[in-house]
Amino acid sequence: MGKKNTLKNFWVRLESASSTVTGSLIYLKPNFPNGKKEPELVFDCGTFLDSENKKYNEDFPCKPANIYAVFITHEHVDHMGRLAGFYNQGYKGKVFASEYAVQVIKSEAIKNFFFTMKNNEEPKHEEKDAISLINGCVPIKIGEIINIDDNVEMVAYNNAHTKGAVMYLITFKYEEHKIRILITGDYKKRSILGKSYFPSSKKYKGKITIVTEATNGTKKKPVAHFKKDLEKSLYEGKSILCSSAGSERYEDILYAIKTMQEAGKISSDIPIYLEVKNAFDLSKLNLNVLPFNFNLVNNSNVRKIALYDKRQKIIVVANYGAFTYYFPNVISKSNWGIFFVNHMYKGSLAERLMTPRGTIIKYCGKEYKKEATAYHTEEFSAHYYIDEFKELIEGFLDINAVFLGHGESESKKELQEEAQKRNGLNVQILKRGEAFKIFEDKIRHSS
């Protein structure tokens, strides 16, 4: 009887701040039978980017002052963009992330604050909050156990989603009982960056609850056609603007171009320009995938050269700010091809450009006549497709439940139904304002 009562009062409350693709934040609050106050934890603290949910950017499902630590899965703004605002509302703790993610977070903290002030926008935080964030960042090592206290430990594992991405396995312990929660963040099994730790070569035996994404829903991996489209466009004499802004990695694009050069599909005389967000993005790994005739756009003068160089060229941009500079200058020119490798949402610019030439396109408050040829592919998606989701799930022998976040409602619903039908899993959809209690061997809704 004593053991049953103990388990009844041993649970972890889980709540998501988001019902959509952006604004990722997972809040965990443990409850132990002995009544001991245990650390409240937050995983990711991302910005809402869509107009419908931007109003929630100052709202959190927890009191920041009560949070013991924040753990970031990767450096994309929809996973870390509200960190300074979290400090503004009372957070005093540390922010743990991979060494690379820490570099990006620090770089963005002050820059974003001054960008907001420069554009006369209402800041969501003060300069002191950005400074607190910079000094609060702590790099973590892959595979190293972090003992948060005697009852809670955490390990970060490699995640192939993007550079510096990790997934976290958190274990809450009480006597011989354990509640294990795996938070993947955005997930990719394998990429040019390497392979994710899970699924591993041996199936994981312990009872586990998985919190993961559902960006692509039940989509199968698309047929690769980027190289074919690029070769055709270049053969027609077009210059190329390729947007890898968002979660799609520019390394994949550059490596595809490099392999095409090596195969004689692209002349090495064609200059390749790359504009990235941070100078330190050019790591040793990046250098290994760089094509011939490569030029880094690292200041306004080189940017002008990239645009006005009359030779046929390829420009790859890895951030939205750079894209807003190039796009208005090429959209109305028939000798340009515009490639999108992002996930194409309804109403997105990529979707609106999949229209005939001569269509009027509205962008940043202005109208442009579309004459350039637009292409789209999701073959470089940094998010898993259905087969990778199945492989992830099959890597665990005893799954308590699966929670789906980071996706549109339809995508999450489709994946939920597929997983329940084929795997017999308890699959729940994370929604803003809803919470769950995770027990050792079950889950239930929480008020």
Predicted regions, residues:
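Redox- and metal-dependent alpha/beta enzyme cores, enriched for Fe-S-associated oxidoreductases
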Residues: 332-372
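Short, surface-exposed amphipathic charged segments that create phosphate/polyanion-binding patches used
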Residues: 148-157, 284-292, 389-392, 439-447
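A general structural motif
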Residues: 219-223, 295-306, 316-323, 356-359, ...
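His/Asp/Glu-rich metal-coordinating catalytic cores
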Residues: 2-71, 76-80, 85-252, 258-265
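Cap/insert and terminal regions of metallo-dependent hydrolase folds
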Residues: 190-274, 360-425
